[in-house]
């Protein structure tokens, strides 16, 4: 009996499932900025994820999930390069893949196409250990199709009919279903004037130097340099990435310098905040010598929090996060910042790709700060932007993103209109 993990057909189906993500990763790697190339490729490849999901036989379901988990989320293990547990990197990739193998086995347990339709649409609600980056809906972020559940259901039905044995009989139905899922506002470009005078900083701070105290002076000088450059451009707000200032800012003399500079330009910066024995991943907004603070609400599973029962959580926190009494804590709710008449919601990395951040917010504009150096080089920045674009379109939001070790950008709620700021060398 052939080992199911080495089923070649399952691997090819997994490649079909993730093809739109990898195609966009290649475009990002070669800095291809023509949006019509991205839209054409995504519109053709994203439905293949549905076709792979539909056609995988039950005895290959586990293998499909295993390969999808490895192909989409191998980068989760790359952060171990900066720990004392580098040797665990291959094991982490395999463990992640096994989790998604089990998940897909359950999702594809029945081969009935309408069961597969419901399980595909429901898969984005299933978050193993709180990790919510498997959102197949987001594969359509840069496609000509709408990204709501109804439209995705129509596309899946079209896949059912167009892949039927009696194609001639069902071809017209399939085509009509695809037409029904089209976004007929394809050529609409959203007005981004509200955020046109904001400077998004892309930094290149290596992860192995970021928390080195000997490198702090260099980080401070680069921050001051970027602020002065933004002032010369007459920008009203400058945005730095997550933990751009990598130590607790509140008790640092550098805070006074930022307060003084905020007389002429507002400064939004990612940093850390200590309160008692709790550590918060925070964003500070300096304006007119005053400061607003928002702490991260949704912590990254296994990176900032152990999503496990307490009897496992405590020893693993001690093992991976060290003997320090300081542990990451989260804020109880999201906060919005107000800058004159401009209101926006600040988000920090992982929480920016989570549905709760968008579904309950009256804010039109979201500003996200990320440190992607943990996972560079990998497909993580592409997958992140795919998810962010999905939420921008799904909830009609404008998302600004300032990142370390990846591209900074402004995402439009319409299909067209994104503005990318390529990372500096």
Swiss-Prot record:
It is found in: Cell inner membrane. Residues 201-425 form the CN hydrolase domain. The active site is at 242 (proton acceptor), 296, 349 (nucleophile). The chain crosses the membrane at residues 10-30, 34-54, 60-80, 88-108, 120-140, 144-164. The keyword Cell membrane applies. Coiled coil: none annotated. One of its GO terms (molecular function) is N-acyltransferase activity. Its EC number is 2.3.1.269. Pathway: Protein modification; lipoprotein biosynthesis (N-acyl transfer). HAMAP family: Lnt. Belongs to the CN hydrolase family. Apolipoprotein N-acyltransferase subfamily. This is Apolipoprotein N-acyltransferase. It comes from Helicobacter pylori (strain J99 / ATCC 700824) (Campylobacter pylori J99). The gene is lnt.
């Amino acid at each position: 009996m052939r080992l199911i993990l080495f089923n070649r057909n399952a691997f090819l189906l997994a490649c079909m499932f993730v093809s739109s993500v990898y195609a966009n990763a290649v475009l990002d790697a070669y800095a291809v900025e023509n949006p019509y190339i991205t839209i054409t490729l995504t519109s053709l490849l994203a439905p293949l994820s549905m076709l792979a999901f539909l056609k995988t036989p039950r005895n290959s379901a586990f293998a499909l999930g295993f390969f999808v988990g490895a192909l989409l989320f191998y980068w989760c293990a790359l952060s171990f390069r900066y720990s004392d547990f580098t040797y665990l990197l291959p094991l982490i990739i395999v463990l992640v893949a096994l989790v998604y193998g089990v998940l897909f086995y359950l999702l594809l347990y029945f081969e009935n196409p309408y069961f597969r339709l419901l399980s595909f649409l429901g898969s984005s609600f299933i978050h193993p250990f709180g990790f919510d980056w498997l959102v197949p809906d987001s594969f359509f972020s840069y496609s000509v199709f709408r990204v709501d559940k109804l439209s995705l259901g129509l596309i899946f039905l079209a896949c059912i009919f167009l892949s039927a044995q009696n194609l001639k009989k069902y071809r017209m139905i399939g085509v009509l279903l695809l037409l029904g899922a089209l976004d007929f506002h394809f050529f609409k470009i959203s007005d981004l004037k509200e955020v046109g005078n904001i400077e998004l900083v892309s930094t290149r701070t290596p992860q192995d130097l970021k928390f080195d105290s000997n490198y702090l002076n260099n980080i401070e000088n680069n921050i001051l340099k970027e602020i002065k450059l933004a002032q010369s451009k007459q920008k009203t707000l400058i945005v730095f990435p997550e933990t751009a200032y990598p130590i607790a800012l509140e008790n640092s003399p550098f805070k006074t310098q930022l307060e003084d500079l905020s007389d002429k330009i507002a400064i939004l910066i990612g940093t850390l905040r200590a309160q008692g024995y709790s550590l918060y991943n925070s964003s500070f907004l300096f304006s007119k010598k005053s400061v607003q603070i928002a702490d991260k609400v949704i912590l990254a599973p296994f990176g900032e929090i152990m999503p496990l029962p307490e009897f496992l959580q405590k020893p693993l926190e001690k093992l991976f996060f060290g003997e320090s009494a300081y542990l990451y804590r989260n804020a109880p709710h999201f906060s919005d910042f107000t800058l004159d008449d401009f209101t926006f919601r600040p988000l920090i990395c992982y929480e920016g790709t989570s549905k709760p951040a968008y579904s309950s917010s009256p804010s039109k504009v979201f500003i996200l700060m990320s440190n992607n150096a943990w996972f560079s080089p990998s497909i993580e920045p592409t997958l992140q932007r795919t998810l962010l674009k999905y939420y921008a379109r799904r909830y009609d939001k404008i998302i600004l993103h300032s990142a370390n070790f990846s591209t900074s950008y402004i995402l439009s709620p319409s299909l067209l209109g994104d503005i990318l700021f390529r990372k500096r060398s």
